[in-house]
Swiss-Prot record:
Inhibited by penicillin G. This is Penicillin-sensitive carboxypeptidase A. PANTHER family: D-ALANYL-D-ALANINE CARBOXYPEPTIDASE, PENICILLIN-SENSITIVE CARBOXYPEPTIDASE A. Gene3D superfamilies: DD-peptidase/beta-lactamase superfamily.
Length: 522
């Protein structure tokens, strides 16, 4: 009986404690002062503790870095409302792109464009053909780091040079790749911190001075009309079959409803070919496999020469060379990129690695303080440090995109750069913030925060790789146009997570929704 009374008493105490605690941490609509700040701290800690409380929890062992500030425009001050490991360096994945894109936004301007010139040895136009109509000694194309250049641009250029019926021959088709100083590596265009599996995936395309279709290409796989037969491979554009031999190891499967296509591709370091394996459904129709271009220079020379030859222009020789070395070359054709504003928007919405790496190298070519021997990417990293003025003790950045796991950045430095760009007097319309994905509406956030208070008012950059998730941005209750509203800036990073990314994303989103409710109630 005595034990029963003790147990009953303990249960009553536990219930009373939970009631008191529940009342303490409830987020009241009218509470936006210091008590409200204390409440938000307790609530965020509860979310993280519930996630990591035991080994059976979905994110047990995950390392968290979280920082949140409230911005009051009436006094221009940022007040911290939550901080956990804000000075600890984490691998942030694509949140690294904030450093790269904000730096080029500050210094190059939204109207910046990239111009890719096509030089000839004599004046040439599509009508007259130049002083000697039938032959050019060379066409030299100088890559200038335009990540948006497409195969359609090449087709347009080929039509320009072949449109004159008297134009019959080009002795040399040259590609000038000297815009980047690539250093002494085996292939200095390949980011040194990237892994082979990155380079053989489309998200890890190599950032070369001349880029076509984001340095990717499509292979069209057609199933055999005989079960057990080999599918066939084809290409859309001239010259692609010469550039990339395809070895088919796949087979055509049966017509049963359970039959599905399981095509995969792989490269071998000792081979110029690509290997296609798996099964191809006989009734599945043509499948398109998009693959990275591992030798972008050779791809350009092979495909552009084939396009010219399709137009009746003979190409005698192709090579890597130098344009305008005599100062007497003539710029006969030019490809112009979209404005930087459009390219930044695309980069941030899609989290495009190639664009970010190209921006890094653009800044490297612009960095006059770098020595001549400094590789362009390294000069770009130094330029970012000079531009953002973030102490190097708060971050280590090794690439422009965040694809490397050797980037180590503190939540404090991430929230600082996003706060600074929002309050930048040179961007009164908050154009940069407008380029970021918007909760439930656009980009990599289009499927997150749906039917929540955060929908439409959270602008943030996502980051994700195995074991890593991050989100850095701002909550603007009244949208971008209200400069007098209070807002919340945040940076959340999770590292070493054993859980599926979706589980960690859910925790991050819970925190952001909580912060959203807090600012809406203040």
């Amino acid at each position: 009986m005595k034990n029963y009374k003790i147990i009953t008493l303990l249960l009553i105490i536990s219930i009373l404690f939970n009631i008191i605690r529940s009342n303490k941490i409830s987020l009241k609509d009218s509470d936006s002062g210091s008590n409200g700040n204390q409440d938000i701290q307790i609530l965020i800690n509860d979310i993280l503790n519930n996630c990591s409380s035991s080994e059976s929890s979905s994110c047990f062992g995950t390392q968290w870095g979280v920082v949140a500030d409230i911005y009051t425009p009436s006094n221009g001050e940022f007040t911290n409302i939550f901080s956990l490991n804000e000075l600890q360096a984490f691998t942030p994945a694509s949140n690294t792109k904030l450093f790269t894109t904000i730096s080029i936004f500050y210094t190059f301007g939204e109207d910046f464009k990239v111009f890719t010139p096509f030089f000839t040895d004599k004046p040439f136009n599509s009508v007259s053909g130049g002083s000697s109509n039938s032959e050019l000694d060379f066409i030299c194309v100088k890559g200038m780091g335009d990540p948006s250049m497409s195969i359609d641009n090449l087709i347009e250029a080929a039509k320009f040079f072949s449109s004159n019926p008297t134009m019959k021959k080009v002795n040399k088709l040259l590609l000038d790749t000297s815009f980047y100083n690539i250093g002494n590596g085996v292939d200095g265009n390949i980011p040194s911190a990237w892994e082979w599996e990155d380079l053989t995936s489309t998200y890890g395309s190599i950032p070369t001075p001349l880029i076509i279709n984001e340095n990717t290409m499509d292979i069209y796989i057609t199933p055999s009309n005989v079960i057990g037969g080999k599918p066939t491979a084809s290409f859309k554009y001239s010259g692609e079959d010469k550039y990339l031999p395809v070895i088919i190891l796949a087979t055509t499967t049966t017509t049963s409803n359970s039959s599905t296509s399981t095509l995969n591709y792989s490269f071998k370091m000792s081979s110029q070919s690509i290997y296609i394996t798996g099964n191809c459904d006989i009734n599945g129709g043509i499948q398109i496999i998009t693959v990275p271009i591992l030798d972008p220079e050779q791809y350009f020379l092979t495909v552009f020469s084939a396009l010219l030859e399709d137009g009746g222009v003979e190409i005698s020789q192709t090579a890597i060379g130098s344009c305008n070395y005599t100062g007497m070359d003539y710029k006969s054709f030019e490809v112009i990129s979209p404005e930087l504003s459009e390219m930044l928007n695309y980069t941030l919405l899609t989290s495009n690695n190639l664009y970010a790496e190209t921006f890094l190298r653009q800044m490297g070519t612009f960095n006059s303080a770098a020595s001549e021997s400094t590789p362009t990417y390294q000069a770009g990293l130094e330029y970012i440090q000079q531009t953002l003025s973030i102490p190097t003790s708060l971050y280590t950045q090794v690439d422009g995109s965040g694809l490397s796991r050797n980037n180590f950045i503190t939540p404090k430095s991430l929230i600082t750069v996003i706060e600074n760009v929002y309050t930048n007097v040179g961007d009164p319309q908050h154009d940069y913030i407008s380029y970021l994905p918007v909760a439930s509406l656009s980009g990599t956030l289009s499927k997150r925060f749906i039917n929540t208070p955060a929908s439409g008012i959270v602008h943030a950059k996502t980051g994700s790789m195995t074991g890593v998730n991050s989100l850095t941005g701002v909550i603007l209750p009244n949208g971008l146009s209200d400069d007098q509203q209070n807002s919340i800036f945040f940076s959340i990073i999770a590292n070493n997570s054993p859980a599926q990314n979706t589980d960690i994303i859910d925790i991050i989103d819970q925190i952001v929704i909580l912060l959203t409710k807090f600012i809406l109630s203040s």
